[in-house]
């Protein structure tokens, strides 16, 4: 493999306006159509749907490998179920879509915003004793939220159409909290394969999931410095099992309340992946998830050259398909090679192969990496190994760049002025906090930012020195509190 052109990646000037760039990408790369005439509801186009299916397969694989079983619950939740858990209904009531009429009448129903209150009544019927636990279920479904804020494609929706929600049931708090820790590891595996960088934060009490004892969240930082929540895991304690009377017979012969968890991710993770790996030319898809891993572009300038080039392309395709690689031959005669290069770069295809008359004579192809635009000459006999090596290099580079960018955005500050300046510059700040909720909410107000919570991926404790709460100076700070502007 011979390097023909060193790295010269596209700039990222357009990503200074993330939402405008994202709309452009979704439209031009034929991923998603935002023109459907219902606010917050959008259309997945065929290329986008193939990408989504690959992400769903990743999610299913990781959950199946960790003892979860897939289920499918109805979209309708009876109001008598939804209204049972008081914290839950207070948290979701303003976002709920109600089915107020069906035919000549009927019961009052809710379009699920999430499924805790749908699943618990059924779980109650399935669990008899401790031998039935733990129970780990998941589904990938649509959920509905009556968003009143501005909606954005994949990011803030009224129909979240790729909502993976897992629900687990356990004998006690210890086992349920162990499951929350496993959920964190599950999400690490998924996001690592998507080449995403992330912070792990314990949400403050005022921002935890409605009905949870606590919430652990994954947040990523987009190029404009605003954060995007891409996953959450909740320890629900006995809050739902108590009101739905989900009990089990323990080994000692007594009936006990089960403990539950839930954890979810959605198409927000795909949005984060597209944006994180984006540039002025489009995006770069991680090779394992790309619908098309290799775009093959035959180059010929006469009818005489065409059969020679296309015959060699057949050899190239046979070698790559035989290795199980996903590829597409762009043999459109009404488009120039340069136009095709732009098109496949826009769509994020990790590698492009060019085959011209001179390449046929040398029995080689020219391979271009989408992430760096480096070019290599590769002999046909070495092609499969070279492609695998280059795809691994693309994946590693995407992941490395994402983590470097995220780490550069997180700063510790000691004063209100420093914090305001850093947030204005698109940073995530860590500030001293006493742990008092009123003080935490006051910090949010003073900074005009959102509290992400206590860091779970770095040292959360202030340590031995005498730091003061950023908002309540009379209180000694015990913890770091992360804040940012967020979507």
Curated annotation (Swiss-Prot):
Belongs to the class-II aminoacyl-tRNA synthetase family. ProS type 3 subfamily. It comes from Pyrobaculum neutrophilum (strain DSM 2338 / JCM 9278 / NBRC 100436 / V24Sta) (Thermoproteus neutrophilus). Its EC number is 6.1.1.15. It holds the Pfam family ProRS-C_1. InterPro entries: aa-tRNA-synt_IIb, aa-tRNA-synth_II, aa-tRNA-synth_II/BPL/LPL, Anticodon-bd, Anticodon-bd_dom_sf, Pro-tRNA-ligase_IIa, Pro-tRNA-ligase_IIa_arc-type, Pro-tRNA_ligase_II_C. It comes from the Archaea. Catalyzes the attachment of proline to tRNA(Pro) in a two-step reaction: proline is first activated by ATP to form Pro-AMP and then transferred to the acceptor end of tRNA(Pro). One of its GO terms (molecular function) is ATP binding. One of its GO terms (biological process) is prolyl-tRNA aminoacylation. Keywords: Aminoacyl-tRNA synthetase, ATP-binding, Cytoplasm, Ligase, Nucleotide-binding, Protein biosynthesis. Homodimer. NCBIfam families: proS_fam_I (TIGR00408). This is Proline--tRNA ligase. Consists of three domains: the N-terminal catalytic domain, the anticodon-binding domain and the C-terminal extension. The keyword Cytoplasm applies. PROSITE patterns: AA_TRNA_LIGASE_II (PS50862). It is found in: Cytoplasm. It catalyses: tRNA(Pro) + L-proline + ATP = L-prolyl-tRNA(Pro) + AMP + diphosphate. The gene is proS. GO terms for cellular component: aminoacyl-tRNA synthetase multienzyme complex; cytoplasm.
């Amino acid at each position: 493999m011979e390097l023909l052109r060193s790295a010269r990646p596209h700039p990222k000037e357009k990503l200074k306006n993330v939402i405008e760039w994202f709309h452009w990408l979704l439209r031009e790369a034929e991923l998603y159509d935002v023109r459907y005439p219902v606010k917050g509801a959008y259309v997945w186009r065929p290329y986008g749907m193939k990408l989504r299916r690959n992400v769903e397969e990743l999610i299913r694989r990781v959950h199946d490998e960790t003892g979860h079983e897939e289920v499918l619950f109805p979209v309708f939740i009876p109001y008598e179920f939804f209204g049972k858990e008081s914290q839950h209904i207070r948290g979701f009531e303003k976002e709920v879509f109600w089915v107020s009429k069906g035919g000549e009448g009927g019961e009052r129903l809710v379009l699920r915003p999430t499924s805790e209150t749908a699943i618990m009544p059924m779980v109650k019927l399935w669990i008899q004793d401790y031998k039935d636990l733990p129970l780990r279920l998941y589904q990938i479904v649509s959920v509905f939220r009556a968003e009143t804020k501005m909606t954005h494609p994949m990011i803030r929706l009224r129909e979240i159409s790729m909502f993976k929600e897992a629900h687990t049931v356990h004998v006690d708090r210890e086992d349920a909290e162990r499951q929350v820790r496993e959920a964190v590891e599950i999400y690490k595996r998924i996001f690592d394969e998507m080449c995403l960088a992330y912070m792990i934060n314990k949400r403050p009490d005022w921002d935890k999931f409605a009905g949870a004892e606590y919430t652990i969240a994954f947040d990523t930082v987009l190029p404009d410095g605003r954060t995007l929540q891409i996953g959450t895991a909740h320890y629900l304690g006995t809050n739902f099992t108590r009101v739905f009377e989900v009990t089990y017979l323990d080994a000692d012969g007594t009936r006990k309340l089960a403990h539950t968890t839930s954890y979810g991710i959605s198409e927000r993770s795909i949005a984060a992946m597209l944006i994180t790996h984006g540039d002025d030319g489009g995006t770069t898809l991680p090779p394992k998830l790309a619908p098309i891993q290799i775009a093959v572009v035959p180059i010929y300038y006469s009818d005489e050259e065409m059969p020679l080039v296309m015959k060699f392309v057949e050899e190239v395709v046979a070698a790559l398909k035989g290795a199980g690689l996903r590829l597409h031959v762009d043999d459109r005669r009404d488009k120039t090679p340069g136009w095709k290069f732009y098109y496949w770069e826009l769509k994020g295809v990790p590698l492009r192969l060019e085959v011209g008359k001179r390449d046929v004579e040398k029995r080689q192809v020219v391979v271009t990496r989408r992430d760096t635009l480096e070019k290599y000459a590769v002999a046909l006999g070495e092609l499969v190994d070279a492609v695998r090596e280059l795809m691994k290099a693309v994946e590693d580079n995407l992941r490395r760049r994402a983590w470097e960018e995220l780490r550069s955005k997180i700063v510790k500050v000691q004063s209100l002025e420093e914090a305001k300046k850093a947030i204005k510059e698109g940073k995530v700040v860590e500030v001293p906090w006493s742990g008092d909720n009123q003080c935490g909410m006051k910090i949010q107000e003073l900074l005009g930012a959102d509290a992400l919570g206590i860091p779970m991926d770095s040292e959360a404790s202030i340590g031995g020195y005498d730091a003061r709460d950023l908002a309540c100076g009379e209180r000694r700070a015990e913890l770091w509190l992360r804040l940012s502007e967020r979507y």
